[in-house]
Amino acid sequence: MFESHVFSRSTAHSAVLYWDKPAAAKAGAQYTVYLDGQPVATCGRTHFTLTDLRSQSDYQADVFFGHQCVGSCVFRTTPVKNRLDVTEAPFWARGDGKTKNTAALQRAIDACGAGDAVYIPAGIYLTGALRLHSNMELYLDEGAILQGTAEIVDYQPRIPSRFEGTEMRCYSSLLNLGTLDHAAGPNCENVVIRGKGTIASGGRELAEKIIADEQEHLKDYLAEHAALVAECENERTIPGRVRPRLINMSNCRNVWVHGLTLKNGASWNQHMIYSDNITTDHCRFVSEGVWNGDGWDPDSSTNCTLFACEFATGGDAVAIKSGKNPEGNKIGRPSAHIYVFDCRSTAGHGICLGSEMSGGIEDVQIWDCDLTNSWSGIEIKATPKRGGYVRGVSVRDCTASRLLVHTVPYNDDGEAAPRQPVFSHLSFERLTLTGRGLRDGSFENVEPIELAGFDTPGHELRDVVLDGITVENETGTMTLPVQYCRGLTIRDLTCAA
């Protein structure tokens, strides 16, 4: 993972521990957690939450897999934060579901120092775009709903952002962290967004309003560039690129999102661009009915960890990205050291790498995920125009509808990169593939495995391992389509009726 094998995120009285899955551990492995030398729990997942801790105190946690020490970490709990209740003086927000609270909430956020936490109690707090800053915490209590409006005006001004791999000005997101600069490091850091409540935006209604407004604004451009529009997924693609996210992080470092329901962004729900050390855990992502409504999207970002989350999305549950075509190649900031484990999909497209991957994607580790109820399962994709690479991917002990490594034709507008992409060094171990994809609430039979590289010599799919794969279907037989591939190893492939 990073420099050791056990990591922590702590509050005043609790700590979430998480660790890399040992190479010898298979599905159902058990771990013993020690705190200051004493065993406190046995668990079957690669994370555990410690509770009833003392504030401002140092602890050592050790994790064992059998007799093997997975690793240790020393952590310190935080001080008890000073609570800035948004419903009290001098903020006076009203959680009645009717009052627009943008100004009141922003005042509380602006007043929040490193020793404070903006506290949102139960209620529905209608708001427009909000702007967070370094060294702050936002806490939503149980029953608290931070509800973004469905009005375009509440997401002004447009801000520098990146969407589907291209930098552009997009509407402000509901929560905005940092300022986009592909040539710089972090300008927003040490932010905690947590609690038991819900952060929701205007979803499909807001998305449709923005697309219609942008289509009118761009009607002459779209008419003059019909060939460009034809290269897109559909006629809404270009107008839809200015939609806000639910949570947008640009040039951020050390952000923790924990315990929340993240719901109905007008496009993607959590988008991290040029960011580092982002942890999201124990969250629920909901965006069914929102076109292109991805869940968790690291984009030219590093050291991003996602675990113990559930997805019911209108797009990919997870989409790992790094820019598009020549711009992405030139900026050249890869997404790397991405870890996804113990996540579950109930609707949506699954876990995807690409298709915007021109800056490169490397060191992606996925384990213990259930993507049975998804359309694409586990997918690595790009168009021939992209350039760049995907390499060093490991997927272990997962169940999915299917496994796809292939080229795709959509989102293919714009100038091509000087060379085709390369997918290489991909390992898939102990997967169960159902061969049934979930789309629009119904299951369809799909090819359980597709492997394809690119047709230019030197850009074939390289060094792929399929080990311990079980394919389920009604007949007990299958085909394995392989195209433009060099160095494919297959061990213990089982086809079961």
Where on the chain are the PLM-derived regions?
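Extracellular/periplasmic carbohydrate-active domains that bind, remodel
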Residues: M1-A497
